[in-house]
Amino acid sequence: MKRRNIMMSVATTCIVSCFLLSGCNGQKQIDSSTIEYINLKEDVHLEDNTTSPTCKMTIDYAYLAEENGNDTIAHKINHTVQSTILGKKYAEMEPQAAIDSFKNVYVREYRNSVADLYKEDVKNGTSKDELPSWYNYEYSLTTQFKDGKEGVLNYTAVTFEYSGGAHPNQWENWLNFDKNTGKRLTLKDVFMAGSETPMSKMLLEKLIKEMATKLDNSNIQSLEDLQNEGILNSTNMYVPDNFLLEKNEASFLYNKYDIAPYAMGTIVLSLPYAEIEKYMIHQTNN
């Protein structure tokens, strides 16, 4: 396991009206912060021999270096990221300790899940070629910070996991942070009350166009047409908690199964700020 450091320039933000009112507390804004990565790549065998099945783990985990004990913004962001991406029990740990602990727990659960079944197969004389593929697990986590809308820091995490079943699973988590305070920005922080209905309608229109293109079917022109393709059969259109306040637009993420079958993959719909600014709280001057 190793660490690598990269420098990300975070432009100093000139805000006439503090973003979402949360930046008016006198704390120093994140500026030219050092982003550190913890890199882990490890193959752990089910038993103490190289012929037994393996759990392959790859983690590329980004966090903010805390320069001193008073760096409350970086600490707050790291705390939220660890709690959201790794789990609440890792929130108070140092990043390196959190990753080490997460790996150890994952490996232990892997062995607890399949070790006895594997031993039984070996005892019964099952050959290596006949062993079920699901004795081999795979887990990867890739994360990154990037600059978003003025005053906002974006964080994305992509998780891939295979632990048996018909196919692997992959999902993403998107987070937004106020650079002035380290506060995570939720939908309620960013969009006005009552904006859910009109924005859902806008996203539905985007989805219809997106699916018509993706499926190469110009006949997809309505909600009913989407439902005929297996989309939005179990839920109404909604504004997801998974969103990014990017530089020129807000992007909304629907993971597999959120609104469509697995085969449709991850769906991302974007709305330019020019179209949704009337629904946003406390706009900044750009």
Question: What spans do the regions from the language model cover?
Answer:
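Bacterial Sec-dependent N-terminal signal peptides
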Residues: M1-T34
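Compositionally biased intrinsically disordered regions enriched in Thr/Gly
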Residues: C24-N286
